[in-house]
Amino acid sequence: MNEFMKKLSLTKPIIQAPMAGGITKPRLASAVSNQGALGSLASGYLKPELLEQQIKEMFELTDAPFQINVFVPLGLEMPPEDQVTKWKENIPLANQVNQFTPVQEEWDDFYQKIDMILRYKVKACSFTFDLPPEDAVKELKTAGCCLIGTASTVEEALLMEERGMDIVVLQGSEAGGHRGAFLPSKGESAIGLMALIPQAADALSVPVIAAGGIIDHRGVKAALTLGAQGVQIGSAFLICHESSAHPVHKQKIREANEADTKLTKLFSGKEARGIVNKWMEEKEQYETQTLPYPYQNTLTKAMRQQASLQNNHDQMSLWAGQGIRSLTEEMSVKQLLHKLCPEDIKI
């Protein structure tokens, strides 16, 4: 048992990725925690009162540790009105948006969620999109909460460690969903996991976790060999029986292969890897002209919601990583974790 597993009282070196948007609800997260891995709730896009309901439900379903992931607000200024108008004309239903959420309201939401994590004594809290503010870090660490940061480069990982993270998740370019990158890059920033793990493991003193394209025990073993103390997995859990992902999303993952995904900003304004669909193909020429996150995300929300109601995969954000070719079978969390971490795996 390594340091990461000891910190969180785990029997398996696995974190179920906290996938926002209604995918990782208590049924999935508790099933993961009950099998000795770390289940995760995603607070992104959730109102604090709904997060509280999910926390209460988690405590009813499991006595094992779990984590809550929190988006760190980016605090970006509102884009120019002419750019907003242009995108409203190009996104179905975007004209329904009359105003964007004020930055201060996003920070209020962030701190309400931190207070909730403290109040309910949640075992671990992870952060995505930026360095968490120092006051939140201090409060959580004083309360004994294990802190997990997300990084896509060694430099970002070092900053996360310096900020006080107990564990750092290294997100390779293979990973599905939103990139956790938060620093500008001079060159190619989409670093693959095989290059990222050993460099970060050598540079950091805290445990590092590998994320991106891992779907079976071979990927787990490889990550551990390269210096990671655990792995974080999203796509494979997304298609489990217990997942609340849209049935069409699950189906498209089962049908896709590694060449069917790409990084795009079109849905949210922030790079995210998903299965290519008609919306991405039609708007590809505008990839470099999107509004910054979360403004683009707000404008596409109604379109994505309508697409989900209509089972229309062509306008859904079908987040998935590059390891999906062999994800052809829907299984239970228990079955998946046995596949990921058979009894003979050495940790």
For each predicted feature, which ranges?
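Active-site entrance/lid segments in N-terminal catalytic domains of soluble metabolic enzymes
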Residues: 1-203
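Conserved active-site-proximal phosphate/metal-binding subdomains
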Residues: 179-183, 187-209, 214-347
